[in-house]
Amino acid sequence: GTGAALALESGVATLGNMEAIQFHPTGIFPAGILVTEGCRGDGGLLRDCDGHRFMPDVEPEKKELASRDVVSRRMEERIAQGKGVKGRFGEHLWLDITLLGEHHIKHNLREVYEICHYFLGVDPTKEWIPVRPAMHYTMGGVRTNYTGESRTLKGLFAAGEASCWDMHGFNRLGGNSVAETVVAGMIVGEFIADFCDKPENGIDIPTSLIYDAAAKVQATLDGFLHNTGNEDAAKIRARMQEIMTSKIGIFRRGEDMESAVSELEDLLKKTYNVPVKYQPGANSELTYAYRTRKMLKVALCTALGAAARKESRGAHFREDYPVRDDKHWLKRTIATWKNENDTLPTLSYENLDISKMELPPGWRGYGAKNYIDNPETPKRQAEIDALRAKMEAEGADRYAIQDAIMPFHSLLPKRLQGRNERIDEPLE
C-alpha cells in the first residue's frame, strides 16, 4: 500500500473504493500462499473435517465455481459451524484434487504440485490440501480516469492494482489480474507518453516547492530518528494486522468496524512516539516504522469506508446489512487525507451513471435476488435491448453493437483503436 499512501499523503490525490478487499478461497494453510482457481475449475472439491463436499449444499447451482467472495464466505461459515479441521495453527478445510489424476496435476497444475510439495510437504496427487481464505487483492486504489491519470492531481498516473479505474467494480473475477496488468500497462503507458509529449504539460514548478517537499520528508524521518518515545513499530503493525483480519475481514459488522476505526486511529497516533534505535547506514528499522504509519493511513481509509457503506456489495459483506442497495449505494467511495496532522481520512462519494453502462446492475446469477433495485436500471436495460435488437436486424456485427451501447474506441490511444483479435484466430 505504499503507492496508495504516497498519493494519499499528497492531500490532493484521492483513493477510491478502498473497502473493496477480495479474499481468495484457497490459500494454503497456514502459509497463505494461493493455489490457483484452476484447481476448482478443473474439478477440485472443497471438503470439511468429515470429508464431506459441502459446496453443493449451500450453492447448489455454482458449487465450487461460485465467485470468490461467495466461496470464501461459505468456507468461513462451514468452519464457524464446527466443521473445520483443527490443527496446530488454527482451523482449515480441505481442497481435494486427487480425483484429477497424477498426470493432469503434474502437467496442468504443476505450480500447485510444487507449492504443496515445497511449502507443505504434501503430495496433492494423493493427499488433500489444507486451505483457508486469504486476503488477496484490492479493487481500490488511486482514483484515476480512463487514461490512468489521477482525477485531482495532474501528472500522477497509476495502473494495475495500484489504481481504481473501474475495471473490476467491487469484485474481481478470477484470472483477470494479469489481464488488467497487461492491458493497463499498454494503455496507460501510451497515455503517459502522450502526456509527456505535450508542451502544455511541461513541468514548471518552483525549485522552492521541491525543497519544501524534501524538507517535509526529512522532518518525518527525523521525527523517528530523534524520538524518545516508548512505542514499538512491530507491535503496532502486528495489532493493525489483527484488527484488519478480525474486524474488516470476510464478514463485517458495524460495531466491529467502528471499533476498528477507533483503535486504528489510536495506533496511528502512537506512531508519533516510535523511536528508531539503530541509525547508521541502511536503516531497515527506520523503513519499517516509516511504512507502518503509511499502512495505518491506508487501513483507516479501508475501515472507515467499510463502516460507512451500509450495504453488502461484491467483496464487501456486512452481516447487519446483507442486501446490496443499488438505490442508495451505487456509488464510489472517495478517500482524501486533507491535512498532514489529520488522524482520519475524509470520505466523499461519486454516483455511478447507469445511463452509460453496458451492463446495468442486476441479479448476479446465483442465490436469492436480495438486492434493492435502482429505478434507472429497467430503463437502461430496455434501451440496451432495443438498440441491440435493432442493430442485429440491420446486420451489424458485435463490435459495432458494443460501441453503440458503450462507446470506448475513441477513448483509446490511436495505435490501439483497431480490433483486438489474434491474426490467426479471428473472433468473427
What do these predicted regions represent?
Residues 1, 132, 174-177:
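Active-site nucleophile and cofactor-binding loops and adjacent substrate-binding regions
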Residues 2-9, 25, 180-187:
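Short amphipathic alpha-helical face segments that pack within enzyme cores
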Residues 100, 104-147, 151-154:
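Accessory "access/gating" subregions that flank catalytic or transport cores
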Residues 11, 19, 42-44, 91-93, ...:
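Structural beta-strand/beta-sheet cores of well-ordered domains, especially the beta-sheet scaffolds
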